[in-house]
Design a protein with these regions (language model features):
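N-terminal secretory signal peptides that target proteins for export/translocation
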Residues: 1-27
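A composition-driven surface/loop motif
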Residues: 2, 7-11, 31-239
Length: 239
């Protein structure tokens, strides 16, 4: 661990030597400069990538693209610069009715969020369990088993822009659309890269059922993914 003294000596060198074997301190201006530079260097050395775990039971979560990471808001409190946003349930066996909104407003915006053993049932909320808005690029990384269920006419995941869902061989996602809604809906492009993804369209509810997966920008499946799409009440598996 570097000390202020060692860093200051690196910046200015050792004290001045005068006759008689007595060291003369550096001028005050140089000592002040050393302290400023040392503090700046220590701040840089001690600044790790910031990450936080967000429990969905504590309230709705909104994630937006920021200059140095994600800006995450929950219960009207915003954390800036989160570079590894992880959303989870405190008890994955009990579904939460709170929802996740991801905002990648501009086409150059990039947002990455990890869902870790998330269990959301928003069937009482009149909205999607996970909504992705804007024209930017969003990546949802899967960690563990994740389940999303939405209300009538709301998809399990509803997305605009470019959406990528990624995971490993032991990671999974089940997205259940509400009545008349798709399991996964994207008005942009959709890429599924790795993991096991099951998308179920909702039942008709007196009208048309929902597709398992519907994307106006096309669907790309890669990375050893296992994808199952089930349309509801005679609807297409893929729309």
């Amino acid at each position: 661990m570097l000390s202020y003294r060692k860093l200051a000596m690196c910046v200015l060198g050792r004290p001045l030597h005068t006759g008689g074997g007595i060291d003369s301190p550096r001028p005050a201006s140089q000592r002040a400069a050393a302290l400023v530079l040392t503090a700046a260097m220590l701040t840089t050395l001690a600044a790790p990538a910031f990450a936080d775990i967000w429990h969905i039971e504590n309230g709705d979560i909104t994630i937006s693209a920021g200059e140095s990471g994600n800006n995450v808001t929950q219960n009207n409190n915003t954390t800036y610069g989160d570079t590894n946003t992880i959303i989870t349930n405190q008890n994955k066996d009990t579904a939460s009715s709170h929802t996740v909104t991801i905002e990648a407003k501009d086409k150059d915006d990039k947002v990455e969020v990890t869902l870790k053993d998330v269990n959301i049932d928003a069937s009482s909320r009149s909205e999607a369990a996970v909504s992705v808005t804007g024209s930017g690029n969003t990546t949802i990384k899967l960690d563990g088993d994740n389940a999303l269920k939405s209300d009538i006419y709301s998809s399990g995941i509803s997305s605009s822009g470019s959406l990528t869902i990624s995971g490993g061989e032991n990671d999974s996602l089940t997205a259940q659309g509400g009545s008349g809604a798709d399991g996964i809906y994207s008005s942009g492009s959709l890429t599924i890269s790795g993991g096991t993804v099951t998308a179920n369209g909702g039942s008709s509810g007196g009208g048309d059922g929902g597709d398992g997966i519907w994307s106006s920008g096309g669907v790309t499946i890669s990375g050893g993914s296992t994808v199952t799409a089930n349309g509801g009440d005679g609807k297409d598996d893929y729309g």
